[in-house]
C-alpha cells in the first residue's frame, strides 16, 4: 500500500487573526475554518495535510527546514513576509519542495509595496485575490502535480 502524499499548509504572520482582521481584504472565515475545509479536501484527494501558522519568520523557516524529505508539497501564504523575506525564499530553495504561493487578497490591487514577492519566481504557481478558495485551488493543483510525478 502506498502512503498518502504529504502536504504542508504554511500560513504567515497575522493570519491567525483571519475573520477579525480587515474582512474587506481577507474575508470573514477564520484560519481554523480554512484549515478544516482544507483537511476535508485533503481526505477527498487522499492526501495527508498538516497545517502550521506562525507570526515569526524564524518559526516558518524552521518548519520548512524540518519538512526536508518529509513533505511532498507546500502551500504557503507568507503574508507580509511575501514582500520582505529573502530568508524565507532561501529556506524554500534549500529544501527543493515544490510549492504554491497563496494570497487571500489580490496583492496587485493593493498598496505598491505589496506588489513585489520574493517567492513568486520560484513557486510552481501563485494564486491571489480569490479569498479562501485560493487555498482549495492550490490543494487541487498539488494533488494533480503529485499524481504526475508519481
Swiss-Prot record:
Organism name: Histophilus somni (strain 2336) (Haemophilus somnus)
Binding-site residues, substrate: 77, 83, 90, 104-105, 114
Function: Catalyzes a trans-dehydration via an enolate intermediate.
Catalytic activity: 3-dehydroquinate = 3-dehydroshikimate + H2O
Site (Transition state stabilizer): 21
Domain of life, per lineage: Bacteria
Assembly and interaction partners: Homododecamer.
Pfam family, one: DHquinase_II
Active site: 26 (proton acceptor), 103 (proton donor)
Gene Ontology biological process terms in this record: amino acid biosynthetic process; aromatic amino acid family biosynthetic process; chorismate biosynthetic process; quinate catabolic process
UniProt pathway: Metabolic intermediate biosynthesis; chorismate biosynthesis; chorismate from D-erythrose 4-phosphate and phosphoenolpyruvate: step 3/7
Name of protein: 3-dehydroquinate dehydratase
NCBIfam families cross-referenced by the UniProt entry: aroQ, PRK05395.1-1, PRK05395.1-2, PRK05395.1-3, PRK05395.1-4
Gene behind this protein: aroQ
Family of the protein in this entry: Belongs to the type-II 3-dehydroquinase family.
Taxonomic lineage: Bacteria, Pseudomonadati, Pseudomonadota, Gammaproteobacteria, Pasteurellales
Disulfide topology: none
InterPro entries in the cross-refs: DHquinase_II (IPR001874), DHquinase_II_CS (IPR018509), DHquinase_II_sf (IPR036441)
GO MF annotation terms: 3-dehydroquinate dehydratase activity
EC number: 4.2.1.10
Keyword Amino-acid biosynthesis listed: yes
Signal sequence segment: none
